[in-house]
Amino acid sequence: MSPSPMKITRGISGARWQLTVCDEAALQTLRIETGEEEILLRCLLNRGLSHTANVKKFLAPEFSADLHSPNLLRDMPQAVARLRLAIRDRQRILIVTDFDVDGTTSSVILSQTLKLLGGTDLISCYIPNRFTEGYGLSPQIVEKASKEGFQVIVTADIGIKSHAEARLAHKLGIDLIICDHHLPDGEDVPAEAFAVLCPKGSSGVDYPNKHLAACGVSLKLAQALLADHPKRDAIIASLAKLTAIGTVADMVDLAESENRAIVAHGLKGLSQPSNNPGLRALLKLSNVGDPITPFDVGFKIGPRINAAGRVAHANSVLNLFEAKTDEEAAKLAFQLDEFNSHRQHIQFVLLEKLKKVVEEQKDSLDRVLLFAGSEEEGFHRGVLGIACSKIVEMTGRPTLICAINEEGMAHGSARSIAGFHLVEALDAVSDVLVKYGGHPMAAGFTVKAAQIEEMRWRLNRHASEVLGEEELGRVLTADAELSLDIATVATTKMLARLEPHGIGNPQPLFLMRRLPLRSVQSLKEKHLKLLIGRDRTIIEALWWNAAEYSPALAGAKEVSLMCRLEINSWNNRETRQLKIIDAAIE
C-alpha cells in the first residue's frame, strides 16, 4: 500500500495528509472469498494482510493455536534443563530485569513460574536502580550475585549486549541465561552465556515472531518449563495477563499474530476477576474500563507501573504483585499512583521547556533533534523517553534527550520516525558513545557531556544521507476516504474487530472531505466540539487540546477531517461520534 497525492496537503495543525492507495483487485478478491465489508478489508490490506487465511486468522486470534513452540528458540532446551537442575539441586537463582513495564512483568512471570516448580526459597529478584546503577546487567551485579551464592542468573529485557558480564559470570561459575528481545550488536549474542533466548540474532533464527517483547520471551520460557505440569494451560493463560500488559506497554508490533493472540487473550483475562490482590488493586485504582482495552494498559495501567522506576525504584511493582492482602495491595497501588503523579509533573515541566525551544527554532530545526541539560534544569532521567515521544509526535523528527549528571556524563533516550533506524544511527556515532542499545524506533545511550555537540553534528550528517526532507514532519495517513452516512455505530462496531490496536495495527484513521460545519464550541477552554452535517445527520466531532485552532475554523462553512470513529454511550443510548486528529479548510 502507498500514499496517494491529495488536494489537501496539510491540515491546520501543520501535519501532512496522505491517503493510502489500496490494491483494488486484491480488495475484490478478499471481498468474494471472505464476505467481509469493504471498509474492514481496506484496513486489513493496509496492514499487510492480503490473503484470505491471514485475514481470517487476524480477525479471530486463538491463544493456544497462535503461540509458537518455545523450542524454536535455539537455546530453550538448555535453559529449561539448567533451571530444572537448579531447583532439583536447591541452587539459588537470581532474576535480573529492566525497570520498565516489560522488565517488571517479566520478573513476575519468571519468579512465579519457578516458584510453581518448587523454587520458592531459591528465587530472588533484582532490578537495578535507574539513577545509581543505570540500565542493564553490570559487572557489579554479577560479582554481588557470586558473593551471595547464586549459581544461576536469569535476565529479562536486558543482557543481549552483556558480553563482558557473560564472560565474568562464566569465570565466577555462574550460568547466565539471557531472555531479551533487543537487537544484538556486531558480536551477535554473548558467546559465554549459558543460554540466550531472543527472537533476534543467531539464537532466534528459527523463531517466526521477531517482535516478541521480553515478557513474551519470559512467557515462552514459562511454557517450556511447565510443559509437563498438569495445570500448564491454566497457568500460561493466567500469566498471559501480565504478558499482555508488558507487550502493549513496550509498544511491539500488534499485527504479529502471536503478539495479537497474547494481548487479546490477556485483555480478556484482565477483564475477569483476579485472585492476585496486587493486580486487583492496580486495576481498581487505574479506573480501567470494562472490558479492559489496550488504551487502558497504555495510558492507565502501564504508566503507573513505569512510574516507580522513573522516579523511585521499580521494586515497588514487584512488592505490589507479591502482596498477600487487599489492604497491603491498596497501599502499594496508591504509592504507584503517587509516583505517577510526580512523574506527570516533572514530565510537564520538561515538555514545556522543550516545546518553547522547538517553537523558537521551528524554521531552522535539525533533521535530528538532540536536547541536553541537567536535572536542575528539568532534565529528569525518568521521563526522557516519554518526552522524546511527545517531541517526535509534535515535530515528526527523530529526537534524543539526555540528562547530564555532576560527573559530566549524559544518560539519554531516543525515539524515531519511519525511515530512521536508531540503532544504525547510534552505530554511526558509536566511537563517541560510552554505551547504547535498543530498537529501530527506541533506544537508550550514555555519552560524555563534552561529546554531545559532536554527536549532534554527526547524527545530522547521517540523517542527511538516509532521510529526505519530505520524510520529516508530522504525517497523517488515512486508511480510506469515508462519507458521513457510512460513519455509523454499526460501522464502528464492525471496525472493533481489528482490535487490539497498537504499534503495527493502529486504530483506523479516515479522511472525510467537505463536511458541512454547523458550529464550533470551546470545551473547558482546551478542547473543541464541532457539529457537522445537515438536518437529521448532525454528528459531534471532538478535537482534544485543539482550542488554538478555533480561529482557523471560525466562519468556515465546510471542513475536511482526519478522524477516527467512536461511539458515545450515554443513558443506555449509543450515538456515533468522531475523534478529530486534524482538520482542513479547502
Range-by-range predicted roles:
Residues 140-215, 219-228, 234, 238:
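Active-site cavity-forming subdomains of large catalytic enzyme subunits
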Residues 476-539:
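Accessory interdomain/linker segments of ATP-dependent helicases and helicase-like nucleic-acid enzymes
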Residues 430-435, 461-468:
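A common structural junction motif
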Residues 437, 495, 514, 556-567:
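OB-fold and OB-like beta-barrel modules that bind single-stranded nucleic acids
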Residues 12, 20-24, 30-151, 172-173, ...:
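Hydrophobic helix-and-loop "lid/oligomerization" segment in the mid-to-C-terminal part
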Residues 536-552:
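Beta-strand/loop nucleic-acid-binding surfaces
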Residues 451-456, 524, 549-550, 557-586:
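OB-fold single-stranded nucleic acid-binding module
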Residues 2-21:
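N-terminal amphipathic/basic leader segments beginning at the initiator methionine
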